[in-house]
C-alpha cells in the first residue's frame, strides 16, 4: 500500500494543535507536531502520515530565501522567519497529499495571539491575515486536495467535523478521534471547551477587521462558507438571533 501524506496548517492560536491531535487519534493516522523537516516519512505502520505547521511563522507557500534568517526578523527586516525546511508547495509534491487548513474568527485569533502569544496587534493580525490568504489560495488552486475546518464549528460540532475529515481522507470515522482534547499536549481538557469561542464578542472587542484588512476578511468569509457542518442561518435570522 502506497503511503498517503497530510499537512495540517493554520495561523497560530487558531486550534491547529487541537485539530492535529484529534486527527492523530485515528488508528491509521500519525501526525507530527511542528516538525521542521519530513520526519513523518520515517513513521511506520500507518496508512496516513502527516505534520502540523503554523502559518506564516513556521511555513509559507514558497520556500524561504537563503538570505532570510532569524537575525533579519530580530532586526525588523523580515516579518517572519519560516523554520520549516520545506514550503507548502514542496509538500504538495508528495504522493497522495492532502491539506487541512483550520480557520478561526479574526478578532478571537488576534486577541489570543496578543494575550497568549505575546504578539503586538500588528504581529498577531499579520499572522491571521497571511494564514487566511494562503488557505484561500490553496482552495482555489487545489480544491480537491484541500479541506477547511472552522475552529468554532469544530468545538461545537466535533463529531460532524471528524466525519468530514475522515471522508476527505478516505478512511472510516472513529469515535476515538473525539478524544483529542484529552490528549492535547499543550492544553489538555476533558472535552471541547466552548468558552474558547466568541471571546472577543463576549468582551466587546472589535478590531474592525473588515475595514483594516478587507481582502483577508472577505477571504475568511468565503472560507467559512466552505466548512460549516450545519447550514448557515439566513441573514434575517442572524440579525434577530
Name these PLM-found stretches.
Residues 1-7, 167, 171-241:
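PAPS-dependent sulfotransferases, especially Golgi type II membrane carbohydrate sulfotransferases
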Residues 1-72, 183-192, 199:
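PAPS-dependent sulfotransferase catalytic core
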Residues 13, 125, 155, 159, ...:
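Generic detection of long, well-ordered alpha-helical segments
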Residues 31-32, 147, 174, 235:
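A local structural micro-motif
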Residues 50, 54-176, 191-200:
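PAPS-dependent sulfotransferase catalytic domain
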Residues 23, 38-44, 91, 139-142, ...:
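Alpha-helix C-terminal capping segments
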Residues 14, 119-120, 150, 205-208:
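Residue-level detector of alpha-helix boundaries and kinks
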